[in-house]
Amino acid sequence: METSHNQELVATILEDNVANELQTIQDFLRWTYSILNRSDIYFGQGHDNPWDESLQLVLSSLHLPIDLPTELFNSRLTPSEKETLVQLVLTRIEQRVPVAYLTNSAWFCGHEFYVDERTIIPRSPISALIQDRFEDLISQEPNHILDLCTGSGCIAIACAYAFPNAEVDAVDLSVDALNVAEINISRHQLEHRVFPIQSNLFENILGQKYDLIVTNPPYVDEEDLADMPEEFHFEPELALGSGSDGLNITKQILKQAPDYLTENGVLVCEVGNSMISLIEQYPDVPFEWVELKNGGLGVFAIQRKDLVKYHDLF
C-alpha cells in the first residue's frame, strides 16, 4: 500500500525528470540511496538497509556484479537503462515490491540465487551455521542431508557447497517453489547432488535416512502475520504462516524427524520469534538454541536420541 508520504515522493521524482538529469552509475546509486532513505518502506528481506538495497537494485538491473570495480561507477548509462532504473525505484516505493523480486536475485551464504514471487526471499540465519559447517552441532561430516521446506533451494545448495561429498534432498510441498529450486540447482550445476522432491514434509520420502536435517519451515503466528509490513504480502503465505502459535508444522517435524535421521543424526530448525512459545510448551525438551554470528535468533539443534526420548510430547 502506498503511503501519502510515498505518493509525494513519487510526484517529486516525476517532476524532477530524473532520467535526463542523472548520467552515471554513481549518479543513480546516490539518487536511489536518497530515495530509499526518504521512503516509507521496510528493509529486511535480504538487506536491512537502503544502501545495500540500492546496490542490488542498480547493479542487478544493469546486469553488473555486486562487486563491480569502483572505477566503473562513472560509466554513463543509456536512455533505456535510465528509464528502467527509474521505473524500478518507482515500483519499489509505490507498490512496496521487495528488491529481490524486482531484480529476480538474492544472496545467501555468498551465492546468488534466482527468486520470484513463487518462493520467499532467502534470509535465514541458518546461513551462519552452514558457513561454519555446523561446527559443534554434528559429530561427523554428513553424507546425506535433507533440506525440508526448501523454497528457492538456497539452504540445500549452500549445504552442497559446504559438504562437497554429500547428497542433498530438497523437499517442498509447493510445486511452484520447487520449480524455482530447480532453476537454482541448474544454475549452480548441482543436478548430480541436489535432488528436488515434492512432498508434504516427509510423506514422499521413502526409506531414506539423513545425517542432518535442516529446515526453515513456516513459523509466523497469526498475530505477527497480520502485522507484517506490506513487502511480506508479496511472498507466498503458505511459506510464512503456521497456525495460531506459529508451530503447527514444526511440531509435525519434531514428531516425524527421528524416523528419518541416522542414529547420530541431528535436526536443525528455525522458528524465529516462535521460539518463546516452543520453550513454554516443551520446557523439558533439550533444544540447543544456537548463538548465531550474524545476529539472528530462533534456531535450535536437537539430537535424534532426544527426539526419540521426548517423542510422545510432540
UniProtKB/Swiss-Prot annotation:
GO MF annotations, alphabetized: nucleic acid binding; protein-glutamine N-methyltransferase activity
InterPro entries: DNA_methylase_N6_adenine_CS (IPR002052), HemK-like (IPR004556), Ribosome_uL3_MTase (IPR017127), SAM-dependent_MTases_sf (IPR029063), Small_mtfrase_dom (IPR007848)
Protein name: Ribosomal protein uL3 glutamine methyltransferase
Family stated for the protein in its record: Belongs to the protein N5-glutamine methyltransferase family. PrmB subfamily.
Organism placement in taxonomy: Bacteria, Pseudomonadati, Pseudomonadota, Gammaproteobacteria, Pasteurellales
GO cellular component, one term: cytosol
CDD domains per UniProt: AdoMet_MTases
Protein's job: Methylates large ribosomal subunit protein uL3 on a specific glutamine residue.
Top-level class of the enzyme under EC nomenclature: transferase
E.C. designation(s): 2.1.1.298
HAMAP family membership: L3_methyltr_PrmB (MF_02125)
Alphabetical GO biological process terms: methylation
UniProtKB keywords: Methyltransferase, S-adenosyl-L-methionine, Transferase
Keyword Metal-binding among record annotations: no
Top-rank lineage group of the source organism: Bacteria
Organism the protein comes from: Haemophilus influenzae (strain ATCC 51907 / DSM 11121 / KW20 / Rd)
Catalytic reaction equation(s): L-glutaminyl-[ribosomal protein uL3] + S-adenosyl-L-methionine = N(5)-methyl-L-glutaminyl-[ribosomal protein uL3] + S-adenosyl-L-homocysteine + H(+)
